[in-house]
A protein has these predicted regions:
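Catalytic loop of short-chain dehydrogenase/reductase
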Residues: 1-12, 18-69
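C-terminal helical subdomain
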Residues: 71, 75-83, 87-129
Length: 129
């Protein structure tokens, strides 16, 4: 189920909208990933399915970027956000929903075409795959 939500869904939506996106001046696809989807820098939690699905979303982002040079594709980690999903027994998430959303929009609006296929934090930092 989680693979359908985090990988298959974004792939199908992207494929459906690509013909329209390719007609726009500066088309971009922004995939909301997670730092937990980094194969090289992710801490290990008991969220294997989630982590694997976000790693797959990152790969999907890279594959689309390689295939569609006229569209900018990036994956963005929204941070550890103060949401129901982000709650922890030990401490509160440090990032507010509004700060995360603003950061994602800032990155999306400022990302250049040559950065297509990249993985970024909501603060604009390059993250390792």
């Amino acid at each position: 189920m989680i693979q359908h939500t985090n990988v298959t869904g974004p792939m199908m939506v992207t494929q459906a909208f690509l013909p329209l996106l390719e007609k726009s001046d500066h088309p971009k696809v922004i995939n909301i990933s997670s730092g937990l989807g980094s194969c090289s820098a992710s801490p290990r939690f008991s969220t294997t399915g989630y982590q694997c699905s976000k790693a797959a979303l990152n790969m999907l982002t890279k594959c689309f970027a390689d295939e569609k040079k006229n569209v900018t594709f990036v994956a963005i980690h929204p941070g550890w956000v103060q949401t129901d999903m982000g709650k922890s027994k030990n401490r509160d998430p440090p990032v507010t929903v509004s700060d995360s959303a603003k950061g994602i929009l800032d990155v999306a609006n400022s990302i250049s075409d040559d950065k297509s296929g990249g993985f970024y934090s909501f603060e604009g930092k390059v993250l390792p795959y």
